[in-house]
């Protein structure tokens, strides 16, 4: 039963209460979020089963305009009277057929009571024909009685299901044993004395079942049945039901012999016969198979499945297929039980004691959160590994290793790269230039500062490799310690990891801390703030008002981003100016609007028009204040936000009232203003009131509700998730009030439009950021100082935060240094390999995990939660330090002495047509006027530092090719694109206010656009096409599209790595359970999983293969792949894990080729065959990733080979755009279009399908298709002379 959280009706019609599911080893139950008591009966009784029945009978069950709504409501509602009256058919009897087909489902039309010949459709027609009520009403009462009995039965079944949905184990003394009938039965499949799988038990079931008899019955029935999907399913279902009824009734006639002794130790005797209850469990598994492949209810199927059923029903009925699939399902459930037992042992059993308080939903939730947090680091590590690997790709485009984190790779790098680097100045220049993309390396940009010593830089990179290797091997591999515990091990003097000298890393993080002042100055400059505001103005704002800038303050995960706050505030401000600003003078300006005292907070949010730079400077100034002043101050004074929680609810209620009253005024001219409507239902009505608790506690409640609602929305339940919007609105008002309080006196001077006149940029910056930092008006707070990481002999080691930035950075080099906080230094080296976007995503995951620590329950071995919370906050601020001090691409490129100036010839020539460089106009897109210096392009630099361009040259040869024709088209569009964009924006504002017209046609409401609006939409679409084409060309020419493909590549690989970690974790739990049940020796388990040596780098696959004997291997192969495998066959499957886990797809070359990405996906599915749900999730995960993050829809085709299903992309055209829909208010999916409308076909396309913008052009989609299919072995075949689009 799938039920974790469910919203149900409360005391009022519109009130919704969240019920959550809980289970332990004795029972399952439901409880309200606000209570701890068992509320299962109460919750089930309040669930709306009547609504479900209305939905089964009516096509739109909750639309009270449906002509049959009241009729069906009377049949379904226990307290409703049956309505036995004809409906209005506009005097045309033929309309009845139309109304029945349009409004009743097939199930509803054919619904009839037991022992009755009248369907619901027949009874409706009798009522319409005027048949007396006394003749029709008894039949309707029978249907009503049948529905009421069904509702009662469904409630009883749901109650029983919930109660029985418990953890299927119990404690007998200190022994964790199966407790449910089904789990006891499944565990009998393990033959403990012989330490094998009990195949004879399943064979005996099939012998008793005698499937050939059922097959003959099904075949005879289908020979007489039409070959439609539902007919086939019903026929098979009826034959199966009759056959199983006979087996249950006559069971004793088929079985002879004594029943076996109960328990796991059954000995696997050939004479063993199952008792009836166990055989009934087997029958249930057979029924589940037929329910899946022969679904009787249409809701369990779709067009694709129906077609497959019609084409393959004979195969689905074959004994070989049925037996294989039923056995697999049974064994999968056994494995799931063993894994669950091993999981509970792993997490909650230590020192021979069970943590019994966690053998329940709290414990299972604890496990889920811990594993999800560790997995969140995997994607970031995948990026870091790729970037480190890019350091060591030599000029011949070959790499000498598969995985940089292995010992073999490190030795190869030392001998083949670092030794050459030490003596080759050209290599050193190139090495420094690449390293400057990641770390604050000194390259010849200052005369008074020497270059970094090459030996120090080599040590830096070695430290980075060690750090990433350490994190990878303890994250990609399943380890007992949490990520935080693994980091703290680095500071343990007894740990081998403590031997790593991080003194060079400490020097580089010291530079970042010292650079904060300069970086902040650069931010003020690059954001345009110093161009529009004089120094004394900025200084007064910050110094006089007491605004301090903190680098970072730990946030709650619900706190909205500034861009969302400002956008919402600007929209509200605009709406209030339009609707409530003074109109009698015709003055709609900002000044007159400021008189509206009630909404003064919104006046800080001014719409940025046409990308005006002075407006952007103002917005950027507010952004700095939001992140570095407002949010840090909220930590000290929560009232800055909490004062606006209840006020925002009240504001929303009043807005709803005013909107309804305005609507009524327009609709009813005689509406009396004294009769204003008072509403109790509004968007934020269900949001809990603030009652004085801490902001963290309030946001925790809100987050729980938000996550529960997000899940319901994902499951296609009705309604919106308003919790995110609510907290955003709260912050809009709160931040506006903060600005009003702090900067009210400077408002007129701060707000645009502004002029650059008489503002000297350099003078302003010098005044704001003098050489003597103590004279600066900015007090920049950072929790880290130099002494956080380095102890200098004889000096204080206090961690003074604010003073870190105020120091001049000088120290006595003779002082002896003692490096500390290696946990932070290790993570710093890794973080420096990430982009800003990746750091933000990772930081968000850390924030969510930190916030969860306060509300989750923890087992007895987690005793240092305060220290964990503090470490998480430190790591979050470390991420902010790295993100804040990350140099821009132009800044890095300007420092480069070599590398960047040759990047086009070295890295990108294969992606650009030669004709481009022969034409002066198109050549200028990549080179400056000297024809030698490349134009600095962000995505080319990012690709150069991160992507496997040596591989992409082969994968995308002929696919990603920038042509002279495309460049000329781009140049032409560049000259006029602003006109198109401005026109598009103006038309969008106009079209937002138009509405579709409606006309009655054949009794249907038909929609259309009038001619005037049609031409506006036509012009909008034409402009949109030009803007979209420009974006496609721009993204391709500046290589943003190739970088997007690289991101897709990394994200897919990271998801796949996550699945290999799932496999390793599950094997750990499975083997642990096998040890616990006495079928695997503990020494073998220890040899595989419990290597605690400091140089342990995994090798999990090799250890499994080498440490299992023949009997162990046969048992594991039966459990995981349902067949006995020899050593080579077994090894061939589990070795599929390594190229995925080690990201070998990125490092392959023609001489060292790997499988295609498509093949790796299928290999992963084979590896996960022990868990069908997880196996099927592989392609779904990739589909969801591409769809949700990249607007790409992918189609897979399944084929069967030797009993295994393989998925492939049949054609590269199976990669499609998921378009962006514009003017959504004109998009009506299921509707009729007025046939007399102007340009009918165009209107039908726009209204029914939406006004679409394709995110990618066809050439990029083909590149993505080839990313999946490319294989060096098929290189000549797959990439020779492709047709360029």
UniProtKB/Swiss-Prot annotation:
E.C. number: 3.1.-.-
Chain segments carrying region HEPN-like fold 1: 353-510
GO annotation terms (biological process): defense response to virus
Protein's UniProt name: CRISPR-associated endoribonuclease Cas13a
Repeat among keywords: yes
Miscellaneous comment in the UniProt entry for this protein: Part of a type VI-A uridine-preferring CRISPR-Cas system.
Coiled-coil ranges from the UniProt annotation: 969-1004
Gene this chain is encoded by: cas13a
Region called Disordered, residue ranges: 794-813
Keyword Ribosomal protein: no
GO molecular function: endonuclease activity; RNA binding
Family classification: Belongs to the CRISPR-associated endoribonuclease Cas13a family.
Cofactor remark from the record: Pre-crRNA processing is metal independent, while crRNA-guided target RNA cleavage is dependent on divalent metal.
InterPro entries per the UniProt record, alphabetical: Cas13a_endoribonuclease (IPR053395)
Keyword annotations: Antiviral defense, Coiled coil, Endonuclease, Hydrolase, Nuclease, Repeat, RNA-binding
């Amino acid at each position: 039963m799938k039920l974790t959280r469910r919203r149900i009706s409360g005391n009022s019609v519109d009130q919704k209460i969240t019920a959550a599911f809980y289970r332990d080893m004795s029972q399952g139950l439901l409880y309200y979020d606000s209570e701890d008591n068992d509320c299962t009966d109460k919750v089930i009784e309040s669930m709306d089963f009547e609504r479900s029945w209305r939905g089964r009978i009516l096509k739109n069950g909750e639309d009270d305009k449906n002509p049959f709504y009241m009729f069906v409501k009377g049949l379904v509602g226990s307290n409703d009277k049956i309505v036995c009256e004809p409906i209005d058919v506009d005097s045309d009897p033929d309309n009845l057929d139309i109304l029945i087909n349009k409004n009743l489902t097939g199930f509803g039309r054919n619904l009839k009571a037991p022992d009755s010949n009248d369907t619901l459709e027949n009874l409706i027609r009798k009522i319409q024909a005027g048949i007396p009520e006394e003749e029709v009403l008894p039949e309707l009462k029978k249907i009503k009685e049948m529905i009421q009995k069904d509702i009662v039965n469904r409630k009883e079944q749901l109650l029983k299901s919930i109660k029985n949905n418990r953890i299927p184990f119990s404690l007998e003394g200190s022994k964790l044993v199966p407790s449910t009938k089904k789990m006891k039965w499944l565990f009998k499949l393990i033959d403990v004395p012989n330490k094998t799988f009990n195949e004879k038990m399943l064979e005996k079931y099939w012998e008793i079942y005698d499937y050939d008899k059922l097959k003959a019955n099904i075949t005879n029935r289908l020979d007489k049945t039409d070959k439609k999907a539902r007919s086939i399913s019903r026929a098979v279902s009826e034959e199966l039901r009759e056959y199983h009824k006979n087996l249950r009734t006559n069971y004793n006639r088929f079985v002879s012999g004594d029943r076996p002794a109960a328990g796991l130790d059954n000995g696997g005797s050939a004479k063993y016969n199952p008792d009836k209850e166990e055989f009934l469990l087997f029958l249930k598994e057979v029924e589940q198979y037929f329910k899946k492949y022969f679904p009787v209810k249409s809701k369990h199927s779709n067009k694709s499945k129906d077609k497959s059923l019609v084409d393959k029903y004979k195969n689905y009925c074959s004994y070989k297929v049925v037996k294989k699939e039923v056995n697999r399902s049974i064994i999968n459930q056994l494995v799931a039980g063993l894994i669950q037992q091993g999981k509970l042992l792993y997490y909650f059993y230590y020192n021979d004691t069970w943590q019994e308080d966690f053998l329940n939903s709290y414990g299972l939730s604890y496990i889920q959160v811990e594993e999800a947090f560790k997995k969140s680091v995997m994607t970031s590590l995948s990026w870091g590994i790729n970037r480190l690997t890019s350091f060591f790709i030599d000029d011949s485009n070959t790499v000498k290793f598969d995985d940089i984190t292995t010992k073999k790779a490190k030795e190869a790098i030392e001998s083949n790269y670092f030794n050459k680097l030490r003596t080759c100045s050209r290599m050193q220049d190139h090495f420094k230039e690449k390293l400057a993309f990641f770390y604050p390396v000194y390259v010849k940009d200052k005369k008074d500062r020497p270059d970094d010593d090459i030996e120090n830089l080599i040590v830096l990179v070695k430290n980075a490799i060690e750090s990433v290797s350490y994190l990878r091997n303890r994250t990609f591999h399943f380890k007992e310690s949490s990520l935080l515990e693994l980091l703290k091990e680095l500071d343990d003097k007894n740990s081998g990891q403590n031997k790593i000298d991080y003194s060079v890393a400490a020097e580089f993080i010291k530079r970042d801390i010292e650079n904060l002042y300069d970086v902040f100055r650069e931010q003020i400059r690059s954001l345009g703030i110093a161009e529009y505001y004089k120094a004394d103005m900025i200084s007064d704002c910050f110094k006089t008002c007491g605004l301090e800038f903190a680098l970072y303050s730990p946030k709650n995960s619900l706190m909205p981003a500034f861009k969302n706050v400002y956008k919402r505030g600007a929209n509200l401000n605009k709406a209030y100016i339009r609707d409530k600003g003074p109109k009698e003078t015709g003055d709609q300006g900002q000044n007159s609007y400021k008189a509206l005292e009630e909404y003064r907070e919104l006046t800080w949010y001014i719409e940025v028009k046409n990308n005006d730079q002075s407006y952007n400077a103002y917005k950027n100034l507010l952004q700095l204040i939001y992140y570095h002043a407002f949010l840090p101050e909220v930590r000290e004074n929560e009232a800055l936000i909490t004062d606006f929680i209840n006020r925002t609810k009240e504001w929303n209620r009043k807005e709803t009232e005013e909107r309804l009253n305005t609507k009524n005024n327009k609709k009813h001219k005689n509406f009396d203003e004294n009769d204003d409507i008072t509403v109790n239902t509004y968007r934020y009505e269900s949001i809990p009131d603030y009652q004085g608790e801490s902001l963290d506690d309030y946001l925790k409640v809100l987050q729980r509700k938000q996550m529960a609602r997000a899940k319901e929305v994902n499951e296609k339940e009705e309604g919106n998730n308003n919790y995110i919007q609510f907290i955003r609105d709260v912050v809009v008002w709160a931040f506006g009030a903060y600005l009003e309080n702090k900067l009210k006196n400077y408002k007129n001077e701060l707000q645009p439009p502004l002029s650059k006149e008489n503002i000297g940029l350099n003078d302003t910056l010098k005044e704001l950021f003098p050489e003597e930092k103590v004279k600066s008006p900015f007090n920049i707070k950072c929790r880290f100082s130099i002494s956080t990481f380095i102890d200098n002999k004889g000096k204080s080691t206090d961690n003074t935060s604010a003073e870190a930035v105020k120091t001049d950075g000088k120290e006595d080099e003779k002082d002896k240094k003692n490096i500390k906080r290696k946990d932070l230094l290790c993570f710093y080296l890794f973080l420096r390999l990430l982009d800003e976007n990746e750091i933000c995503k990772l930081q968000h995951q850390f924030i969510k995990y930190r916030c969860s620590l306060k509300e989750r329950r923890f087992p007895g071995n987690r005793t240092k939660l305060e220290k964990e919370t503090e470490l998480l906050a430190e790591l979050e601020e470390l991420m902010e330090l790295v993100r804040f001090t990350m140099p821009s691409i132009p800044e890095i490129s300007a420092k480069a002495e070599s590398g960047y100036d040759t990047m086009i010839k070295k890295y990108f020539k294969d992606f650009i047509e030669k004709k481009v460089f022969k034409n002066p106009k198109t050549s200028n897109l990549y080179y400056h006027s000297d024809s030698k210096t490349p134009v600095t392009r962000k995505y080319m630099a990012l690709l150069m530092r991160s992507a496997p361009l040596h591989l992409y040259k082969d994968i995308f040869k002929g696919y990603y090719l920038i042509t002279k024709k495309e460049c000329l088209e781009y140049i032409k569009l560049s000259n006029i694109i602003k006109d198109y964009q401005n026109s598009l924006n103006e038309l969008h504002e106009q079209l937002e206010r138009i509405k579709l017209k409606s006309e009655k046609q054949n009794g249907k409401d038909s929609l259309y656009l009038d001619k005037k609006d049609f031409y506006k939409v036509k012009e909008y679409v034409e402009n949109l096409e030009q803007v979209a084409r420009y974006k496609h060309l721009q993204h391709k020419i500046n290589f943003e599209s190739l970088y997007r493909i690289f991101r897709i590549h990394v994200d897919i690989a990271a998801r796949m790595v996550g699945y290999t970690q799932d496999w390793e974790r599950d094997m750990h739990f499975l083997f642990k359970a096998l040890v616990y049940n006495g079928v695997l020796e503990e020494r073998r388990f220890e040899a595989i999983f419990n290597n605690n040596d400091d140089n342990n780098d995994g090798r999990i696959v090799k250890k499994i293969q080498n440490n299992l004997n023949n009997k162990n291997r046969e048992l594991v192969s039966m459990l995981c792949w349902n067949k006995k495998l020899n050593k080579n066959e077994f090894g061939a499957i589990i070795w599929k894990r390594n190229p995925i886990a080690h990201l070998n797809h990125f490092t392959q070359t023609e001489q060292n080729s790997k499988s295609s990405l498509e093949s790796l996906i299928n290999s992963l599915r084979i590896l996960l065959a022990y868990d069908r749900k997880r196996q099927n999730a592989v392609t779904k995960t990739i589909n969801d990733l591409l769809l949700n993050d990249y607007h790409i829809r992918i189609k897979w085709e399944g084929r069967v080979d030797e009993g295994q299903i393989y998925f492939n992309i049949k054609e590269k055209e199976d990669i499609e755009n998921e378009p962006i829909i514009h003017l959504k208010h004109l998009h009506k999916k299921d509707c009729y279009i007025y046939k007399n409308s102007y340009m009918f076909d165009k209107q039908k396309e726009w209204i029914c399908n939406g006004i679409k913008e394709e995110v990618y052009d066809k050439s990029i989609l083909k590149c993505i298709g080839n990313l999946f299919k490319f294989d060096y072995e098929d290189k000549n075949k797959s990439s020779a002379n492709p047709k360029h689009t």
